[in-house]
């Protein structure tokens, strides 16, 4: 009963960041699609967290992290804005898609949490996520 080695082919993954110039200062938005391979996605998340530490705040970090609820916030130390299942899109049972924030004011944080939504769309096996951020 030797353990079997399972080689998994994964596709290239990316992270994109944009810092928007608003009337009240910068707003940074980061999105990523992490690996579905357990452990590797956590390593990717830790690497991204180090990279975004130097980006301007406030900051939103969202996307398909392929990690269950609670894990991304624990790994990054960022504040979760959404805690709802997003997968599979036809009957969501687990949260793999996340919206995290850092540097929001208490008023922005409250408004963002109340506006965070999950959308079931016929284009993916995951639900889409969205949030509105009020600018002071």
Question: How would you label these PLM feature ranges?
Answer:
Residues 2-8, 30-39:
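Surface-exposed cleft-lining segments at the edges of enzyme active sites
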Residues 8-12, 37-41, 92, 121-123:
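Solvent-exposed loop/turn segments connecting transmembrane beta-strands
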Residues 20, 27-31, 54, 60, ...:
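A shared catalytic/ligand-binding motif for oxyanion handling
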Residues 33, 64, 126:
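Histidine-centered divalent metal-coordination motifs
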Residues 82, 107-120, 128:
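Low-complexity, intrinsically disordered Gly/Pro/Thr-rich segments
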Residues 17-24, 102-103, 124, 130-136:
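Active-site beta-strand termini and strand-to-loop segments that position acidic
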Residues 37-108:
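Metal-dependent phosphoesterases centered on the DNase I-like endonuclease/exonuclease/phosphatase
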Residues 1-26, 113, 117-120:
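Structured beta-strand-rich core segments of catalytic domains in phosphoester-bond hydrolases
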């Amino acid at each position: 009963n030797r353990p079997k080695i399972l080689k998994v082919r994964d596709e290239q993954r990316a992270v994109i960041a944009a810092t928007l110039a608003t009337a009240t200062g910068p707003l940074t938005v980061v999105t990523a699609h992490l690996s579905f391979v357990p452990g590797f996605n956590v390593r990717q998340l830790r690497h991204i967290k180090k990279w975004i530490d130097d980006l301007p705040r406030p900051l939103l970090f969202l996307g398909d992290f392929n990690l269950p609820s609670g894990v991304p916030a624990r790994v990054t130390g960022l504040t979760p804005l959404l805690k709802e299942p997003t997968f599979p899109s036809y009957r969501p049972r687990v949260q793999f898609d996340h919206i995290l924030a850092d540097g929001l004011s208490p008023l922005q944080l409250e408004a963002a949490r109340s506006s965070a939504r999950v959308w079931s769309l016929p284009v993916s096996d995951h639900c889409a996520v969205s949030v509105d951020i009020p600018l002071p």
